[in-house]
Amino acid sequence: MSYEERANAHPNLGDESDVEEEALVNDYREQVNFDDGMSELDRTTSLGGGSQTQDLQAQLAAAATPLEYQATLETKFASYDNYCSLFHYILNSDGPVELEVPSYYWAWDVIDEFIYQFESFCRYRNRVARSGSNEEEAQLLRENPNTWGCYSVLNVLYSLIQRSQINEQLAAIKRGEDPLAFAGEYGSRPLYKMLGYFSIIGLLRVHCLLGDFSLALKTLDDIEMNKKAMFARVMAAHFTTYYYVGFSYMMMRRYADAIRMFSHILVYVSRTKNFQKGGNSYDAIAKKNDQMYALIAICVALHPTRLDDTIHSALREKYGEQLNRLQHGGPEALPLFEELFRSACPKFISPTPPDFENPALNVDPVDHHTAIFMDEVKNTLYNPTIRSYLKLYTTMDLKKLAGFLEVEPEKLRSWLLINKQRSRQVRWVEGGLLEGEPVNANDLDYALENDLIHVSETKAGRRLVDWYLRNLARVY
């Protein structure tokens, strides 16, 4: 099959056919069955042989191995030095490093662990600076401000992407052209291609942790978000990608797109969970699974919409009571919004080292982004109550509605204007993840003419044919 035919065979983002879903599930089953308990890195073989290649294999194996939970500060410093040495050798050797690798897993493990150690070190450093309780560690951190620095980590990821020319290769695949024509001397090697590819997913994660959600989505411009993508072949990478894309959409108030992303991966996980058990990443995936259901509950409360039956049932089972409270709105829902957000959001980090001399000036990045999100929630607190009244009328006097709500008419007018503005969302149709068209996100619309509210409502009928087909498949 030519590259053009393969490109045309790729489904678009909205393609959710059962045949392709089943194919991906079967592919994942094969991956699990193939794993005989040995690490993928243990099966790595060398093209060149010799001690130098064996040393590189050992370094890659160490880079993919999680650091101990209670690792000392000196161990974290040493781990950073080891990563620097490894990536310097890969990126700056005279010519590409000759190493053949058998699978995608090892490259994801290396990038994933690299970013996890960066994230955990930043949180630890911020915690030491804010507490001021351990002067010895604070002094060590003060003397080494560039260790696990944001610039260093981003430089590694961007360098791996540039060296492998992976973006050019992905763009060529989109155009139906041969990616090897754009790969260059380095990008044609699996070592560089895989590290470069998963560095793109790593950039998505890092930019999201830093709070730059637009740039996070921008990094995936050349990656097709479908079941044929390379990241979809590694369960942890598949899950991570959709989690951070969905969360970025949520923070940009694109709730419909966030729900679509979360729903896609949660449906997939529900179909593969029986043979995930026992895998190394099962516990982490199960935790992220619960977090995404919490985020869907938040999104549905802020943007009422119909969910897939599988997602809706699981959501009711996990967060039924909380979802009802969120959907009713009002001041009493604020603590619950904050609780769910804190439990499900990424562990944000600061791009700069903390101020060790003035601990009180250091702000927890999670607190900072939670406050930003809660400001948005406060703007929409009374939307459910207002909607419940407006649904009863086609026209209504502003002062009459203000009397029902026991608020000043001008305050109600500002609420209505905010709600009207929030109901217009950008929704993805095609192209890059940042692209989209503004649409009215609610089934209830209204217009203000002086003090008269004109209300219109559109109701989408339930697609009974799809419902019957899904349930017949379960029975038979």
From Swiss-Prot:
Keywords: Cytoplasm, Initiation factor, Protein biosynthesis. Residues 257-452 form the PCI domain. One of its GO terms (cellular component) is eukaryotic 48S preinitiation complex. One of its GO terms (molecular function) is translation initiation factor activity. Its main location: cytoplasm. The keyword Membrane does not apply. It holds the Pfam family Paf67. GO terms for biological process: formation of cytoplasmic translation initiation complex. It is found in: Cytoplasm. Component of the eukaryotic translation initiation factor 3 (eIF-3) complex. PANTHER family: EUKARYOTIC TRANSLATION INITIATION FACTOR 3 (PTHR13242), EUKARYOTIC TRANSLATION INITIATION FACTOR 3 SUBUNIT L (PTHR13242:SF0). Component of the eukaryotic translation initiation factor 3 (eIF-3) complex, which is involved in protein synthesis of a specialized repertoire of mRNAs and, together with other initiation factors, stimulates binding of mRNA and methionyl-tRNAi to the 40S ribosome. The eIF-3 complex specifically targets and initiates translation of a subset of mRNAs involved in cell proliferation. Belongs to the eIF-3 subunit L family. This is Eukaryotic translation initiation factor 3 subunit L. It comes from Aspergillus niger (strain ATCC MYA-4892 / CBS 513.88 / FGSC A1513).
